[in-house]
From Swiss-Prot:
Its main location: cytoplasm. GO terms for cellular component: cytoplasm. It comes from Christiangramia forsetii (strain DSM 17595 / CGMCC 1.15422 / KT0803). It is an enzyme of class 2 (transferase). This is Nucleoside diphosphate kinase. It is found in: Cytoplasm. Belongs to the NDK family.
Amino acid sequence: MADNRTFTMIKPDAVENGHIGGILDQITASGFRIVALKLTQMTQRDAETFYAVHNERPFFGELVEFMTRGPIVAAILEKDNAVEDFRTLIGATNPEDAAEGTIRKKYAKSIGENAVHGSDSDENAQIEGAFHFAGREMF
């Protein structure tokens, strides 16, 4: 995945609260093109693997439990400067600190239930996208 692609997940809290459409609308209205999209459910093993970087952190167990409690929407997005622009669009991890109009300000409940994941680097965007999508699933 080049620097014009990023990976995102709409997390279980936002799916449960019916925010898929609103979030996808905001993403596309911000100039991103969706090149891969799926509704899926992470298993415990999936979540533990995906978030392995956090496995020594005190919140790891809660994170895995949260990410497996319901379906997620995984997507690969395309736009120039995709990773940085998407991080700006979603806002700060804690919705209380997020700028007005950002996805997390609009849809997140708390720092733990913060509606969306966005890759933090081009390298991680490639790794995370490949975790959820086979090459034939990207257009």
